[in-house]
UniProtKB/Swiss-Prot annotation:
One of its GO terms (cellular component) is gamma-tubulin ring complex. The keyword Cytoplasm applies. This is Mitotic-spindle organizing protein 1. Belongs to the MOZART1 family. Required for the recruitment and the assembly of the gamma-tubulin ring complex (gTuRC) at the centrosome. The gTuRC regulates the minus-end nucleation of alpha-beta tubulin heterodimers that grow into microtubule protafilaments, a critical step in centrosome duplication and spindle formation. The lineage of its organism: Eukaryota, Metazoa, Chordata, Craniata, Vertebrata. It holds the Pfam family MOZART1. InterPro entries: MZT1 (IPR022214). The modification N-acetylalanine is found at A2. It comes from Homo sapiens (Human). Its main location: cytoplasm. It comes from the Eukaryota. It is found in: Cytoplasm, Cytoskeleton, Microtubule organizing center, Centrosome; Cytoplasm, Cytoskeleton, Spindle. Keywords: Acetylation, Cytoplasm, Cytoskeleton. GO terms for biological process: gamma-tubulin complex localization; microtubule nucleation by interphase microtubule organizing center; mitotic spindle assembly.
Length: 82
């Protein structure tokens, strides 16, 4: 009987942890929107995971900015040739 209550407690703790993660991501997404970062939930989630793995947030920000510039340049060049 004790093992089933232990499993129930573990499931409840896992559910509470998942809810906390979701709430944290919702708050981060709202901050991201306020700061007008243009990041969607999936991209923001990837950035958070990269930072958790030790990637420097400032370096990550620089890479994102450079990728956006390169994308805009490619779009502009594509529009010139069409």
């Amino acid at each position: 009987m004790a093992s089933s209550s232990g499993a129930g407690a573990a499931a409840a703790a896992a559910a509470a942890n998942l809810n906390a993660v979701r709430e944290t991501m919702d708050v981060l997404l709202e901050i991201s929107r306020i700061l007008n970062t243009g990041l969607d939930m999936e991209t923001l989630s990837i950035c958070v995971r990269l930072c958790e793995q030790g990637i420097n947030p400032e370096a990550l920000s620089s890479v994102i900015k450079e990728l956006r510039k390169a994308t805009e340049a490619l779009k502009a060049a594509e529009n010139m040739t069409s």
